[in-house]
Swiss-Prot record:
The gene is CRK2. The modification Phosphoserine is found at S454, S483. This is Cysteine-rich receptor-like protein kinase 2. Residues 280-649 are cytoplasmic. Keywords: ATP-binding, Glycoprotein, Kinase, Membrane, Nucleotide-binding, Phosphoprotein, Receptor, Repeat, Serine/threonine-protein kinase, Signal, Transferase, Transmembrane, Transmembrane helix. The keyword Ligase does not apply. It comes from Arabidopsis thaliana (Mouse-ear cress).
Amino acid sequence: MKKEPVHILPLYLPCLLMFLLSSLRQITGDARARAVKVTCSPLLEHNETAYVPNFVATMEKISTQVQTSGFGVALTGTGPDANYGLAQCYGDLPLNDCVLCYAEARTMLPQCYPQNGGRIFLDGCFMRAENYSFYNEYKGPEDSIVCGNTTRKNKTFGDAVRQGLRNAVTEASGTGGYARASAKAGESESESAFVLANCWRTLSPDSCKQCLENASASVVKGCLPWSEGRALHTGCFLRYSDQDFLNKIPRNGRSRGSVVVIVVSVLSSVVVFMIGVAVSVYICKRRTIKRKRRGSKDVEKMAKTLKDSSLNFKYSTLEKATGSFDNANKLGQGGFGTVYKGVLPDGRDIAVKRLFFNNRHRATDFYNEVNMISTVEHKNLVRLLGCSCSGPESLLVYEYLQNKSLDRFIFDVNRGKTLDWQRRYTIIVGTAEGLVYLHEQSSVKIIHRDIKASNILLDSKLQAKIADFGLARSFQDDKSHISTAIAGTLGYMAPEYLAHGQLTEMVDVYSFGVLVLEIVTGKQNTKSKMSDYSDSLITEAWKHFQSGELEKIYDPNLDWKSQYDSHIIKKEIARVVQIGLLCTQEIPSLRPPMSKLLHMLKNKEEVLPLPSNPPFMDERVMELRDGSDGDSAGCASLATVSQSSFYGR
């Protein structure tokens, strides 16, 4: 077949020129990425498996649009699994600041899970996601106001606010849904009122006008005489203040001749630069083609190697061992397969994971799991005995652990009594030791990506063993971001990974921190806030840590007060909670590595650093003053626990 020539310059030159020229027009403003309020849908998401990929895909589609227009809508999925999204920056926000505001909103909105939708108002932008088309809605029961409480103003200021609101609402209703206005309070410039009014671009002019009029009436009635007020309505955002919060209207500060000189300089540089780009792209393209071909051969080669190795089990042997995969022997169900108990001809108990896949990606996952687990061996990792890749489906064979998974104990009122504090502490330390091995001591560094209670198995002595390497990925020291799909379990996933796909060992550290808090409290991260929109477990632990009342969240099954050394145990538990909070800090670089955490756990007298705020601290209502909004809707957190099996996926 004749190879088509690669025309690089015509393809990349216009794109690069547009980027460089647009960069000349960028201005520096205030991204106003401070969250004002988050409101979540009252209904639960019915399909956990579909939610994450649909939400992430919707956000990616919107991201592309926001970068060019400051606005985006997208739909992913169908029926009850559909994810409708909308994001819009307010009209005075420069595009580069808009992108920053959107990135912040995208990071925070997932806290609504497992509710099936939610909306977030920031001071610079708005975002909403639901499982139905809401684009034409302009009012609803969630409409509310948020008022500042710094200063009470006089009647003259109130008159200026009313005038500014009238001007902004009138202008926005007739000019595409956005307006800014200011009005003097008497003769004093320092007492002026500044107003911003913005409708979502999906609304009709009539709906926009109605929304802004309702918003104006509510903020005047509810916020004056306070110096600041915001109306957070279904179809619009309105704000007034005695401070000029608006970004300046950009002015052309250069002469036309200066701009020409800059453009000519840029164009002359581009000619030279594009030669390098053309060569680089050509080389990268050739390498990619070779890598794809090599990857296909690698899968086939690995399959043959496994079939000929000592790890290989006959399919018929495993089928017989599990009673033809009888449901009576079923141990659990996960996203990638079902796990069964089996008995080999020599009497050994085994756990068999039955995988179904019909594409190369799933096949690669299978060989990746076998290849990775077979190279690691540690007392706190589940041992892989072998596999079968010759039958109608692929099978993994693990050692069988009769106590199954940790979640069966800590989240059960009766079984939880089996695990006193010392046993739970040992499980925490054992899990940490397993992660230290994966991150720092194995021949290939491994990020597990799905550390959670159902993936911590317990042997006959209740020692912890980490299971489920199906999601594990090896990584290089210079690689902190991956392009593969995000995988894991909501509630254990670090915010930077869920929002941006940023994968480092700190993703496991975050998950470990959530697990530690669950072990201490006996609460699931989701279940802790399922009623009345109460706080997530992380936020609950943080607040009690701040108030010095941690013992209020301890699992009653710990029964620490009845022990003769209860004061020592109380101190140990509080220390472990503090370690859990260090793991779940919002900024990844502040989280200690697993080796440091293990050192902290074992050296009980060492002084610990104070943790900073966890993600989504003000997750119920992020507002300026308590009790100021009319309909204070609660908000669930990011956290949830999946239905994964206790032998992993």
